[in-house]
């Protein structure tokens, strides 16, 4: 069992229940899933780039990614419908908690020139999205074996109804928001 999950159950639930005056523990927001997405537009010309991106995402998440395909053709980007253009992973349960712990304690502090995460990146319904410019902040990625520095999108989906509740949930885990 991940330490953060135990911490959530034992401490965070009680804090948030008191702060927002919930009548039931089931009303307290929780993290539902974490989605990692890596767009690889250059995969149109070199298929090996997509394979390397899949390998990176597998190492980061511990789960095999789904290859995403273009929904429609766009002549300006020279893509046709059905072309593979990226990969994504949805983490839930145990793997989600382990990834969240690694993200907060190891990966985010390794971001170059890090001054905190933007607290305005909530979507209006308590979900938080952030972008990472380099996949090498994760300790699972070996810097010497990286063919190209790629970024990825990380979306933390919560059951919170408002941004304030979502921010309080993530702040309870010492999520490094910018002051």
From Swiss-Prot:
The keyword Ribonucleoprotein belongs to this UniProt entry's keyword annotation: yes
Keyword Ribosomal protein: yes
Protein name (database record): Large ribosomal subunit protein uL5
Keywords, comma-separated and alphabetical: Ribonucleoprotein, Ribosomal protein, RNA-binding, rRNA-binding, tRNA-binding
Gene that specifies this protein: rplE
Family according to the record: Belongs to the universal ribosomal protein uL5 family.
Described function: This is one of the proteins that bind and probably mediate the attachment of the 5S RNA into the large ribosomal subunit, where it forms part of the central protuberance. In the 70S ribosome it contacts protein S13 of the 30S subunit (bridge B1b), connecting the 2 subunits; this bridge is implicated in subunit movement. Contacts the P site tRNA; the 5S rRNA and some of its associated proteins might help stabilize positioning of ribosome-bound tRNAs.
Signal peptide stretch: none
Lineage: Bacteria, Pseudomonadati, Pseudomonadota, Gammaproteobacteria, Pasteurellales
Subunit relationships: Part of the 50S ribosomal subunit; part of the 5S rRNA/L5/L18/L25 subcomplex. Contacts the 5S rRNA and the P site tRNA. Forms a bridge to the 30S subunit in the 70S ribosome.
Organism this protein belongs to: Glaesserella parasuis serovar 5 (strain SH0165) (Haemophilus parasuis)
A GO MF term: rRNA binding
Gene Ontology BP annotations: translation
Gene3D superfamilies linked: 3.30.1440.10
Gene Ontology annotations for the cellular component aspect, listed alphabetically: ribonucleoprotein complex; ribosome
Pfam family, one: Ribosomal_L5_C
């Amino acid at each position: 069992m991940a330490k953060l999950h135990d911490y959530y159950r034992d401490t965070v639930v009680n804090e948030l229940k008191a702060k927002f005056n919930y009548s039931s523990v089931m009303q307290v927001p929780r993290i539902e899933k974490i989605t990692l997405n890596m767009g690889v537009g250059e995969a149109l010309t070199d298929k090996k780039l997509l394979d390397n991106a899949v390998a990176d995402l597998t190492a980061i998440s511990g789960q095999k990614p789904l290859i995403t395909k273009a929904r429609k053709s766009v002549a300006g980007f020279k893509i046709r419908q059905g072309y593979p253009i990226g990969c994504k992973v949805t983490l839930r349960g145990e793997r989600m908690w382990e990834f969240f712990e690694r993200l907060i304690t190891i990966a985010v502090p390794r971001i170059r020139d890090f001054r905190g995460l933007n607290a305005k990146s909530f979507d209006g319904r308590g979900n938080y999205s952030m972008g990472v410019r380099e996949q090498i902040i994760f300790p699972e990625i070996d810097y010497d074996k990286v063919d190209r520095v790629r970024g990825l999108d990380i979306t933390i989906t919560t059951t919170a109804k408002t941004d304030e509740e979502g921010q309080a949930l993530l702040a309870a885990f010492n999520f490094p928001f910018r002051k």
